[in-house]
Amino acid sequence: MHFLAPERGGLFVDCTVGLGGHSEAILEASNDTRVIGIDRDSAALNATSERLAHFGERFRAEHADFREVSRILEDLGEREPAGILADLGVSSLQFDSSTRGFSFRFDAPLDMRMNPESDEESAADLLLRLPEEEIAALIFQYGEERNSRRIAKWIVESREQGKPITTTKELADLVARAAGKRKNWHIHPATRTFQALRIAVNRELEELDRFVTTAIDLLQPDGRFVVISFHSLEDRIMKQELRRHAGYCQCDSRSRIQADLCTCGARRAVEILTKRPVVPDSIEIDANPRSRSAKLRACRKLTTEISNSQ
């Protein structure tokens, strides 16, 4: 909450409202705050609407993808929020569900869709349709799994033998066998593969850079933009994009804008509030072990954008 500064009052947009913890804290910070909470998971949205009902019209729930924030504000006749927050990744409601397929702790259909009501492909659908090379590529790219080719080979071999992977247990067991035993395993061998499939199914990295630009453009002058990410791929994008909007040319990431040379669209529109990502301390990790990999980055929109030539 420190970086959002909700005590100032105004409109805040919680782009991934989940169970509403952040939204509740924003609403409690000042009687002058309002929150629009966005989520593509209708179950989470319904639970949050009930949880925050006592705030009345100060909270409004919208069933949509966080990347639709510009359209939502336009439809509602709202403009220039004081703050925008995006807490990326899987919510506790999704991860703890025994039926949604996000976790290998439960034997469930291999779904992984954040919006189970959508017509999008499930994780099982992807593994049934994609060729071996594409499965290996997505597991390596999104999961940074060094055994991606071997895992993909085993998945396709099982499919060709008339045994397609359709449940979380089947996938977790196959990955454990394919990866083989290694000493000092600190995480389950299927963790990276599950992450990769979830990212692919929900297209989590697609247009993330464009979302940053949209959010910054929507903010009022001095408005705050805060993003919490949970894996290195997201955090890398957030770091690069915030630096680009702070005027650091990504053509040469060490330099400020050189107007005649820059082709990456760098501009000085924000002040970065977090020189390094903010990570949870040991007390917070003990209270919430899932926060261990969280990284928070924040920026403040400048009152006047500084041109490339200045």
Question: Where on the chain are the PLM-derived regions?
Answer:
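S-adenosyl-L-methionine-dependent methyltransferase catalytic core, i.e., the SAM/SAH-binding region
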Residues: 1-310
